[in-house]
Amino acid sequence: MDHNQYLLTMFFADDDSFFKYLASQDDESSLSDILQITQYLDFLLLLLIQSKNKLEAVGHCYESLSEEYRQLTKFTDFQDFKKLFNKVPIVTDGRVKLNKGYLFDFVISLMRFKKESSLATTAIDPVRYIDPRRNIAFSNVMDILKSNKVNNN
């Protein structure tokens, strides 16, 4: 198994194996592994944003990536709430689990798709979704552009 496959499979799994793995590594290795993860997440984000733009081109607003969408966290009891927001350091003496089922298949497919995609032939700059309501500089630029539109008409 390739190291990136190993990392991504642990990262996408719904357990704390990824954190246990990182805790057992030295700082340089951990940062290198996190950089590998962010490169794949940037690729996924690029795909999502392009897909959202295609939907918006046909008039459908995809709320999950739209600026007006606000995500609510649903929990039924305080155990779920505690699990969601628990920031207790991870114990490193536990075993790391690796899901070799559908999640592993997804990771392999993601890696192959990234390698063979036309998007991968060009250098992918880190993609970040900017919400103008939370980014003051971008919001100010948009305000200037809007005010110039009004003044020019």
Swiss-Prot record:
A GO CC annotation recorded here is: host cell cytoplasm
Any idea where this protein resides? Virion; Host cytoplasm
User: Cross-referenced InterPro entries, in alphabetical order?
Assistant: Poxvirus_J1 (IPR005006)
Signal peptide interval: none
The highest taxon in the source lineage is: Viruses
- List the induction conditions: Expressed in the late phase of the viral replicative cycle.
Coiled-coil residue windows: none
Q: Quick one: effect of changing P132 to D/S?
A: Blockage of virion morphogenesis at non-permissve temperature and loss of association with A30L, G7L, and F10L proteins
Q: Which UniProt keywords apply?
A: Host cytoplasm, Late protein, Virion
The UniProt function text for this chain reads:
Late protein which is a part of a large complex required for early virion morphogenesis. This complex participates in the formation of virosomes and the incorporation of virosomal contents into nascent immature virions. Plays a role in DNA packaging during immature virions (IV) formation.
Membership in a protein family: Belongs to the orthopoxvirus OPG100 family.
Q: How does it assemble?
A: Homodimer. Part of a complex composed of the kinase OPG054, OPG092, OPG114, OPG115, OPG142 and OPG157. Interacts with OPG175.
What's the protein called, per UniProt?
Virion assembly protein OPG100
Species this protein is from: Vaccinia virus (strain Western Reserve) (VACV)
